């Protein structure tokens, strides 16, 4: 029965028979799970988002637009993997995208005029060679204002640090190549705290390495009241790990990636769990995935 999504997904999980869906593969299972949901929506003559939702109340999401790439997504750029602009001061989604495009074009122009590279990284953001991580924030603020918009009103800034890629498990330190130094989790949190006071930062994803639970708790106590702290690698869209994160108060928002957990039902369970305690959710694609638009309906 295509209308019984939970039963279908349970059957797929049972058929796979492994904890991490390694037999059939999470991507294969997810493809069947999502295709079934699409078929059921078409059959019932509903929009996909209406078919998925158990509520009649809908909210248009705010886009997070990746405009500067670093880390593993762009060699020789910043240590931080993604610098994003968040268009919050616009009446419609299309207005927000239009404004985001204008800032992107201004960013390209400003980089060119500063003799900085405008080649792009894996995620489509520019990957200039910059002297420091903070200089990327300064460049973003300049791009926003030179486009005729106001920082803090029309646009906010979000970061995906991907700190696990900087972390040395033996020394328990983070290698900031651009800063030419190694820092502790506490020092990294202190850096974020300084930036949050100085720049219109609204969200920091993967600010610390996965499984560094104590440091995540400390970071959340330190800056969690001022900024969204999004856990991706720490919680992996997994309801069990999300429950642990909620209990320990590590983070205050979760990145949701359907192909990280493997079925639509488990994805919706994770979203429901996160929202039940008032945490934020950020729906995300995966690097290198297809152009399928399913996640826009979640």
Q: Language-model features: where?
A:
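Metal- or metallocofactor-binding catalytic centers and their adjacent structured scaffolds
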Residues: 1-42, 46, 97, 125
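Generic secondary-structure signature for well-ordered alpha-helical cores
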Residues: 1, 13-17, 41-46, 53, ...
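Acidic, glycine-rich active-site loops and adjacent beta-strand->loop/helix elements
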Residues: 12-18, 54-58, 68, 89-90, ...
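Glycine/threonine-rich beta-strand-loop-alpha-helix active-site module
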Residues: 46-64
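Active-site-proximal beta-alpha loop/turn segments in soluble metabolic enzymes
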Residues: 82-93, 117-133, 165-179
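Flexible, glycine/charged-enriched surface loops at secondary-structure junctions
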Residues: 2-8, 26, 48-51, 108-125, ...
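Mobile "lid/hinge" segments at catalytic clefts and subdomain interfaces of large enzymes
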Residues: 58-121
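Catalytic core of soluble alpha/beta enzymes
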Residues: 134-298
């Amino acid at each position: 029965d295509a209308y019984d999504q939970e039963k279908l997904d349970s059957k797929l999980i049972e058929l796979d028979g492994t904890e991490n869906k390694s037999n059939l593969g999470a991507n294969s299972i997810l493809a069947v799970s999502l295709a079934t949901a699409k078929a059921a929506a078409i059959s019932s003559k509903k929009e996909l988002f209406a078919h998925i939702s158990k509520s009649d109340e809908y909210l248009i999401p705010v886009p997070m637009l990746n405009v500067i790439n670093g880390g593993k997504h762009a060699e020789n750029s910043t240590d931080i993997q993604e610098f994003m602009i968040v268009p919050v001061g616009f009446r419609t989604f299309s207005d927000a995208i239009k404004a985001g495009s204008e800032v992107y074009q201004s960013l390209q122009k400003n980089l060119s005029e500063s003799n900085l590279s405008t080649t792009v990284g894996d995620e489509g953001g520019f990957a200039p060679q910059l002297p420091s991580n903070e200089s990327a924030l300064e460049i973003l603020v300049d791009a926003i204002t030179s486009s005729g918009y106001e920082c803090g009103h029309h646009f906010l800034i979000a970061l995906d640090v991907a700190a696990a890629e900087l972390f040395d498990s033996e020394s328990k330190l983070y290698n900031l190549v651009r800063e030419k130094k190694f820092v502790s989790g506490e020092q990294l949190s202190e850096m974020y705290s300084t930036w949050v006071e100085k720049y219109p930062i609204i969200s920091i994803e993967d600010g610390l390495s996965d499984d560094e639970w104590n440091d995540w708790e400390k970071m959340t106590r330190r800056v969690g009241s001022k900024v969204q702290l999004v856990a991706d690698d720490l919680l992996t869209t997994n309801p069990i790990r999300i429950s642990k994160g909620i209990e320990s108060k590590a983070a205050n928002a979760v990145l949701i990636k359907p192909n990280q957990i493997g079925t639509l039902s488990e994805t919706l369970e994770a979203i429901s769990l996160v929202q039940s305690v008032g945490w934020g959710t950020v729906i995300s694609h995966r690097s290198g995935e297809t152009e399928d638009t399913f996640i826009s309906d979640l």
